[in-house]
């Protein structure tokens, strides 16, 4: 709940900016100005960097024993009140519920969010740069040696944070449609954040989380570039990249494990995160037919072959488990983090999860043949019996995680058995994106209810889908970035696992 609320806040107030949402309430106390933060480089081109708070500050790793006392500048940030409305019409039934879409009947959903008056605390950079002049970092410290050895992390300092000034509550409501034609209702979680005026609570709330004053909900960092000598500099410009000088001397060693050496969508180890330089903005052209994805999708077929080769019972188990995960966004994120760690040689950490979530995650890893040899929260050893299978699962879960805002629609497409038809579109679409409805490959999409679900899913991934009496037309929207590709990674993954499994 907390992660969803902070993510929405950053998206609404600083989209494309430098703010990073705090993902866990218990991590808020770790958001300390001048504290050290590690940034794990991206694995796939669509992933966002992962950040981890260390227990030390910049002062603690400098060679001299003279502590830095940063000048903190505090100011009003905003009074944040967000209102999200979603008008939906009509309905279509799936195996897990009725989804309101299309024509005939109306629905309305409103989500109000308020963190109240927010304050911004930031370090006076000019003064800080004077304070650290001619000072060096102790590269022999045990902590920094661990960061250097991992090779895929960048050291940062925390330069700013956004904090609440009054108590707030986050309330998770579950809206359920009535049973229709014997089909169970479809639940959708709605996250609401509001400032507490008194002790009263909503009666229909299923989960309530209280946020105390002075809670950090977002923060910003500055990457450090650290030289052999221990001298360091702040990376203040977009084109500057943090890291350790040692990396470049070692020949730009690939930070990723051998599992993924041939992965076409891997993020270049020396690329920076700003989309102007990563090429994400121009990855897929605007107003283009889905046929532009054909080359990448041919590689996907190879990458997902381990799914195809699985015995039918194991295929079905993986497919059903992943379909269930689509209704639990937090578990998708946790699973992606663990697979990232395994595939980069790090030790997974499940301490943020409750025991049930830990068990579910371990059960999923065992489906992949990843045998764990210790307690859930201390996964010291893992023995992947099939590295190619682990690679395929990592690719699919990473794509699903990026589609977090539309996971219910993706689940609906799985249940409506339209995934095979969607996977055919790039291969049979003409140069202008047209596909004739007479093709048996797209017969499942001729139903108006199914089409409306697919249209909304495609729109969320920057694909415009239209249907006439005789044809479908699917083209990318303006500056689609990597989103059409990510959607098709997810679709191909489910298709390879048996898109029609019941």
Could you describe each region identified by the protein language model?
Residues 90-94, 182-186:
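Residues on the lipid-exposed face of transmembrane beta-strands in outer-membrane beta-barrel proteins
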Residues 97-99, 189-191:
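Outer-envelope beta-barrel architecture signal
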Residues 215, 222, 228, 236, ...:
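Long, helix-rich, hydrophobic modules that act as membrane-proximal anchors or helical bundle/coiled-coil regulators
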